Each structure stands twice: as C-alpha cells, then as structure tokens.
Amino acid sequence: MGSADERRFEVLRAIVADFVATQEPIGSKSLVERHNLGVSSATVRNDMAVLEAEGYITQPHTSSGRVPTEKGYREFVDQLEDVKPLSSAERRAIQSFLESGVDLDDVLRRAVRLLAQLTRQVAVVQYPTLSTSTVRHLEVIALTPARLLMVVITDSGRVDQRIVELGDVIDDHQLAQLREILGQALEGKKLSAASVAVADLASQLGGAGGLGDAVGRAATVLLESLVEHTEERLLLGGTANLTRNAADFGGSLRSILEALEEQVVVLRLLAAQQEAGKVTVRIGHETASEQMVGTSMVSTAYGTAHTVYGGMGVVGPTRMDYPGTIASVAAVALYIGDVLGAR
C-alpha cells in the first residue's frame, strides 16, 4: 500500500470510528479536528473524494458529510491489525460468570446473556451439534427391579435422562451386565455413531428374553434420545438491542427479527464456523440473505483444542464497533470451551 493509499485508509478508519461513535455523517473539518491526520482539510477532502469514487464511503441525501459503505467496512475490518483486548479484570469476570453455570444449558444461557451485554448487540449461541458431541459416560440406575434410569453425559456437558420400563425384573448382576454392554456400545463414540451402535443392539438382542430383552428395551429408549438430538438449537439474547439501533436498519427491522426467530439463516452461517479461535466477520450482503441486509455478523466456533462444539457470535448493524465486538466474541468463545471442556 503506497503512502497516498495508506493516508486514505487512515481517513477511512477515522470516518468509520467517528460514524460508529456518533451515527452522524462525517465531514472533512471534523476529521481534521478529531484526528491527528497530519494533513490539511483540503487534502482530507480530496482523499474523501477518492474514497467515494472507489465506493468506500457515500453521501446521504440529507447531509454534506460521508458515511462508510459495506465495502468501506470490509476494508476497515480486513486492515485491522490490533483487536481491542479485554482487560484482565474483564476476562476474569467472564470466566467466573461462566464457571458458575450449573450445567450445559446454564453455561450457554449465561454466555448469550453476557455477550449481548458486552457488545450491546443480539447474541447467538448454537447448542453443541450432534455430529461433534461424544458420549463421555452412560450410567444405568435401578429405580425398581423392573424400572431403570439411564443417564447419558456427552463431552460437551449435555446430560439426558430417560426411564426404561422392563418387561421382567433383573437382579444386580444382570444390571451390571446391562451397564457394561451399553457402556461398551456407546462410550467414546460420536452421537451419530452411537445411535447406529444402539440400533444394532436393539435389533440383535431385543426380544431375546431375560437380559437380551432388557438390552433391547434400553437400546430402543436410548435411540429415541439420540435421534431427538439431531435438531439444531439456537439461543438468542439481547434482541431488544436491535430496536435501540432501529434507525440503522431503515424499514428492514421486521424482516431481520423474523430471520432471527426462524433461525435458519443464522444456523447456516454458524455451521460454516469449523475452527475454534478464528473470528469471521460478514458485512451486509455477505450474509447472503435478503432478510439480513443492513446487518453484520461476527462469529466464531467454540470448543476444545480437538473438538468444535458449535458456533456463536453477534448480529447487529453494519455500523458496529468491530474491534471491540471481535474481542468480546473471541473471549467468550474461549472461556465457553474451557468451561465445558473441564467438565
């Protein structure tokens, strides 16, 4: 990037920063007054003319100032060198708040609420997906000699409990055998593979009488549980923040709210997040959704060093504090992964 290009990018960066802060179109005089650009107002005007001709900024009809375009925001984000770091106190507060969650649901609810507060945007967190979750442990408990409680725990912290009604009573020795058979079939397997293994058990041993009948009944109930988890789930928080920024969306606020409620677009964008620690910024039309025009989405994946559990991020207007939002999304994702991975 040549010196003139570098100077124009500094002008663009100043326009983005001021417009995000003030929501008012930016003129050359205010840029010279607020920023140490080292050039005259006339030079800044010339640079703004070039930026406008190249599509990075535009002039609203009602103002003599300029505002960034989607292309301008994209250039600004692509040229970001330093993402605003969170303070050590902020990081400790995030970690402590998430660690206080009692289970997977509570941790994710806390995460979505926290992210909405940090960014003042709509926060979205995808529940751990079926394809990536692994069965960590299966426990089988006899409530009565003919009634069992099965508890499935995944590596992401998901806990599912099911009751199994047996046709015949089983003794403690048979209960231990049942626990071993089911544990060997499930533990350490991805949920998708576990459902296949359980289906095989049900077909091989179901109806064989005695222990075989108990295995078949338990496997059938487990299969129902595993199949139910195929549905993608999304947590939303801070939707009221959209109305606070209603002016940024023109007349499209209703369609944005509908897209968030339907979840399909957001889940599609989050599904593309395959690498924990890498933050993706989609601006305006980059979301590839007419319903989401006028919005930006900052997202990443969360999980452990070896497993991605799901995606998370924020949705807000293109007039967004990108450095601060990127830092917040990255930090919350990191601590969600740490908290869930330690359980």
From Swiss-Prot:
Negative regulator of class I heat shock genes (grpE-dnaK-dnaJ and groELS operons). Prevents heat-shock induction of these operons. It comes from the Bacteria. InterPro entries: GAF-like_dom_sf, HrcA, HrcA_C, WH-like_DNA-bd_sf, WH_DNA-bd_sf, WHTH_transcript_rep_HrcA_IDD. NCBIfam families: hrcA. One of its GO terms (biological process) is negative regulation of DNA-templated transcription. The gene is hrcA. GO terms for molecular function: DNA binding. This is Heat-inducible transcription repressor HrcA. The keyword Transcription applies. Coiled coil: none annotated. Keywords: Repressor, Stress response, Transcription, Transcription regulation. Belongs to the HrcA family.
